Amino acid sequence: YLLPVVKNTSWYRIHDVLHGMTAPAFLFSAGFAAFLSFQRKRESYLHFDRRLVVRVRRILFVVAMGYFVHLPYLSLRKTILRTQQGLADPFALDILQCIGTGLLVFTLLALVVRGRETRLALASLLTALLFFTLAPVMAGLHGPWFVEPLFSPVRSLFPLTPWVGFLLLGATAAWLYGQVAPVFFLS
């Protein structure tokens, strides 16, 4: 909506860079908060029990709400009767599905490493690097209409690769903060 002369100014380029940091910072913060929550509730990440089921159900609710807001109609029948292109729209990923999926990945990593903080931070870092590395490859893949939006930046605003990587980097940063904070911030 801005004139090209405005977009060519140096302050606009600075604004554009800062504006581009919003989504990664939001996902990074979600990962940071997830790790802090993990530290407080570590026991609930160790076993397949009621607490874990409640956590996963809450995360799946966030993912479901992300899909719900994309439905073109409130009628499932009308949605199903749309064309193949029309069906892809409800499956496009937005920030809610990205956060939910990232939290599911983080929860799975916590279960696999049995709640050990250092291992969880390392697993989060390596998985984040995997998400970043696979992004160009996954973006070029073509698959079924319901799978393609998971990885295609053309079909989704927030495909899983690379965006979940920012959440996992946030989790790693929270662990790192826990390691260095006592040194720099004496209580």
Regions found by a protein language model. Name each.
Residues 43-53, 112-120, 178-187:
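Membrane-interface helix-boundary motifs at transmembrane edges
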Residues 69-179:
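Hydrophobic alpha-helical segments with transmembrane-like composition
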Residues 2-83, 88-103, 112:
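Membrane helical hairpin/interfacial module
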